[in-house]
Amino acid sequence: QSVKESEGGLFKPTDTLTLTCTVSGFSLSGYDMSWVRQAPGKGLEWIGVIYASGSTYYATWAKSRSTITRTSBTVBLMDSLTAQDTATYFCARGHTGLSYLKSSVDVWGPGTLVTVS
């Protein structure tokens, strides 16, 4: 059972980022899936989750600019980029929520670097 993010790359502010998380070995219909990011030198920052039911929930800062969707075997993140969004982006199985002490994540992707300049 694994998840893997698509390639990131170099973007400009106001670009729209689209990342795809491809899953293998399990069905998305049975799991919540989260997107998380980590800026250089910073801690993990939760972006949002798509629940097994298909409904979504976002961090307050991401609510107006991020969209998480899914297909049968992928989870997509779309985000309107700003200059502050350089980070490694991770897909994770489970719901990190706002507190990592209460995280239910059990599978992490390797991450993909997104540079905004």
Swiss-Prot record:
Keywords: Adaptive immunity, Disulfide bond, Immunity, Immunoglobulin, Pyrrolidone carboxylic acid. Signal peptide: none annotated. Residues 1-106 form the Ig-like domain. InterPro entries: Ig-like_dom, Ig-like_dom_sf, Ig-like_fold, Ig_sub, Ig_V-set, IgHV. GO terms for biological process: adaptive immune response. The modification Pyrrolidone carboxylic acid is found at Q1. Disulfide bonds join C21-C91. One of its GO terms (cellular component) is immunoglobulin complex. Pfam families: V-set. This chain was obtained from antibody to type III pneumococci and was isolated from the serum of a single rabbit. This is Ig heavy chain V-A2 region K-25. It comes from Oryctolagus cuniculus.
